[in-house]
Amino acid sequence: LTVVFVLGESLRPDHLGLNGYERNTTPLLSKEDIISFKNIHTEYTYTNRSLPHILTRADSLNPDRAFTEESFVSLFNSCNYYTVWLANQESAKSYAYFMHECDSLFYANIEKSSYVFDKWVDESLFPLFDSALKSAADKKLIILHTIGSHWWYNSHYTDSFAGYQPVTKSKIISSCTKEEMINSYDNTVLYTDYFIHSLIGKLRNERAILVYLSDHGEALGEDGIWLHASQSPVTQQTAGMVWMSASYKADYPQKYEKAMQKRDKKMRTDFLFHSLLDAGGIDSQYKDYTLSIFR
């Protein structure tokens, strides 16, 4: 069994064609059997705070768990999963501990910085992902931490995904038009569509489930606010989706049905910890399956 968790970056649910956005920013995923959740709320709107919250049992009533408990990775380890973290973002103090809970940790684009203009794209993770999939372990948990739709948008998609024009030409936001900002952002969404679809292609013949959750949303000019790390409501709405291979679905038809029923349900990111344990069939005193999207 292979459980894949894709940790997204700055992806808004309302900019996905899958969710009814006026632009078809998800031409590839729209052809797949994707369960997309339109109503996920995140407490924190920047990576350093949201990640510890997402990876652990922390919730709004017990936020300290993000710093006093281990993540779901340790529970997968204890159930004989081979666990691997594939990083396309540098580690930060607030979540480095969780990365090192994994059996293996690999970086793509280790020297990249958001201050440069060259390409820093998620397909750099593909060779690492292919290697992890080839591991001899019967049970695998593969975590991919993506750069996704982080600002400077233009460096996070390849030229063939620059479908929406004109795009931003300056890193000084005040000298960009709203149209350019949204076009550049939507091109990152087109690229994320390609990235997730490519992972699905590699998992199609496996007994596998892929869960995607972005760390937070992104402000695109609402109330004059741009990017994230603000309490703007759009930055607290985040994208999430699930894909199951045919053999996984055949083994767990009820998980598929239950997740389908929750597409429009209001949820907090608290669901992730418990849902991943559920997806991997992990029994633990820490699980609360009432929070699982598969129940």
Give residue spans per PLM region.
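Catalytic domains that recognize anionic headgroups
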Residues: 1-295
